[in-house]
Amino acid sequence: MSNYINQVSDSLKNHISELANNPCLFLRNPNVNFSRKRKIDFKTFIGIMMNSGGATMSKELLDFFDFDKNTPSVSAFTQQRSKVLPEAFEYLFKSFTDDNLPTTNNYHGYRLIACDGSNLTIATNQKDPETFWERNQHGSIVNKLHLNAFYDVLNRIYTDVLVQTAADYNEFRACATMIDRSKLENVILVADRGYENYNIFAHAIEKGWKFAIRVKDKNSNGIASGLNLPPNDEFDIDITQIFSRENTKTTKNAGYKWMPVNQVFDYLPRKSDKTYELSFRIIRFPIGSNSY
């Protein structure tokens, strides 16, 4: 175990050094930023960010610099932080993860990749419309980001993340984007009812992935309610849907399912006269005494 910890730690240090050796790619003004010698240089800044927990920034700085009397001020740190692009940490996450992604644990040869999202409360700022979310139960203003993530369930590691602001928050779009940019093969995508979406199904199929996504029951207003399903309490059937953007007598007689123009489906542009065939399996089974 100690060898593995040292290996992972050394890998992280190497990727931080690689990042620090090419800072111009991740600075707002590469010709000026971090050009002067400061106690918080680019590599030190990355180290502070990676080591920070939930304490105040002044406490984090004191911890990082071992309570040195010449510890840089919060203002100095904030000035350096303003120079760095978010892409620096995206690069570090992806390069480090790709280098340390385990391949040993799988389910019948497949990676189990779970997708979910969560709100992250950040510092209150009434002047930031992109992150202004809502008023909380106490009537206070709340600013949030939304974190979308892919998590390798059996290997217990995040494989991708996508952060959205309140203004552009869309879990369907985030999931489809992470599917498209993934390099992983032999994947079973696992998600809850929040990801019940034909566009996600199609992206997974086009990627060559399998998926197991929970959907609302057939008596609700979800996808299952619009399908011709057996009356049985339990069933396991294959479904094929042919989608069309056109809602004409011809398409209706052909049995095509109309895809409204306000519904995002990347494989059928809004004015397309083509069709798209989507096949999947739907299973209904009990998960409680009176629920399926």
Q: Residue locations for each model-derived region?
A:
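Short Lys/Arg-enriched helix C-cap and helix-to-coil transition segments
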Residues: 88-99
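Intrinsically disordered, low-complexity basic tails/linkers immediately adjacent to helix-turn-helix/homeobox/MYB/SANT
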Residues: 97-110
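Single, function-defining residue in the core of a domain
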Residues: 1-55, 63, 71-72, 76-84, ...
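Extracytosolic and intramembrane catalytic regions of membrane-associated proteins
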Residues: 133
